[in-house]
Amino acid sequence: MGCGLYGMLAFALLTVFMAGLMVGRTPEYIGKKINAFDMKMVCIIILVPPLCLLLATAITTLFPAAQQLQADGGWLSNTGSHGFSEILYAYTSMAGNNGSAFAGFQANTVLTNVMGGTVMLLVRFLPMVAVIYLAQSLASKKYVPAGSGTLATTSPLFVGFLIVIVLIVGALTFLPVLALGPLAEFFTQLHVLG
């Protein structure tokens, strides 16, 4: 069972909240008013997975063995930006409960196993708990009929706004770390080939 449905619902709630802020109205979703508690739960759902995998990547890169080649007793077959990409991909995969890694990363170490297990546990269950609290909060609210200022969640405007919100949150979350790994490697190879 995946977590894509409640992840997308969290982004839909964030979109409704942002739209409500832009027009100065209390945000509503499926006839329920969205309050601060709901937004805290949405933030947990959206931010826990990237924070866990980025924190695990950062902690792993601090260890000297994560900066050395395997021939020198390290965990990487490549150093630099590609080595960083290997570590980032391993934890991204663990956060998605896939468990794959680049062949150049020695993933079967005590640190990687403990960090990976912790990442999998936190990324899977913390958002689930937040979703349960969010569902309880929404279920306990009275239905409010849609007014003239309510953003219809079936409109193309909402879909476009949702896509923009997902792209902005994704870019703000991952663009800095992608600049250190895959993008840096791309531009390095571009410079070498050019």
Predicted regions located by residue number:
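P-loop potassium selectivity filter motif centered on the GYG triad
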Residues: 1-3, 70-122, 177-194
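Membrane-embedded translocation segments of transport machinery
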Residues: 1-28, 32, 36, 40, ...
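Pore domain of cation channels
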Residues: 1-20, 104-138
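Short helix-terminus and kink motifs of transmembrane alpha helices
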Residues: 16, 20, 24-28, 132, ...
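Alpha-helical transmembrane segments
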Residues: 21-35, 133-153
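Hydrophobic alpha-helical transmembrane segments
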Residues: 43, 115, 159-163
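Juxtamembrane and boundary regions of transmembrane helices in multi-pass small-molecule transporters
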Residues: 132-143, 169, 177-179, 183-184
